[in-house]
Every structure is written in structure tokens, then in C-alpha cells.
């Protein structure tokens, strides 16, 4: 029987989101993300402080992710994710880990 499994590709990055960042463009600032997976179907975000995220563009509504939601995992079929925009408004640096596939 021929193997019909599609190879799994992913991207992963650990970085520090500077405090007081507004719409931090993850794709531009972390250039090794979205390389293997330019259009992700799933995202997992780990963070050590509350963050706000917009998916794909800066005009989308902010999704507030309190620390109790870490890790945040997008639901199956959530949407095609081409970029992330992160906001931190309390002046604290945030350790962020992103997984895309």
C-alpha cells in the first residue's frame, strides 16, 4: 500500500516581546517564523504574561489571552494564519513561544 501521509512541516520560535509593544509584527520581527509554514492551519502560543493577539492583520479585533490561557491552541479549522500581531500594554517583557503547522 502506498504511503499517502502528507509530510508534516512546522515552524517554532522562542522570543521576548518587549513591554509596551503594540501590534508587534511577528512575521517581520521573527523572520524565521512562517518560512516552512507560510499559511498555518494551527498555532500554539506559550507566554508568561498576558498578551493580546490579532490574527493576520492589524485591523482584526484583539483577542485577550490571560496567563491562565497559556498555552493557547487554535481550534481545528480556526482560520488560515499568515501572521500574528502581539500587544503588551503593561510595560513588562513577555517570553513567547510560537508553534505553527
Task: Give names to the regions the model predicted.
Residues 1-20, 99-101:
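Short, intrinsically disordered N-terminal pre-domain segments
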Residues 16-37:
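Surface-exposed ligand/attachment interfaces on beta-rich extracellular proteins
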Residues 19-21, 51, 92:
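Short tyrosine-centred short linear motifs in exposed loops/low-complexity segments
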Residues 30-35, 61-81:
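Beta-sandwich interaction modules
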Residues 40-43, 76-94:
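Noncatalytic modules at the cell exterior or secretory-pathway interfaces
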Residues 44-61, 97-100:
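Short, surface-exposed beta-strand/strand-loop-strand elements in extracellular ectodomains
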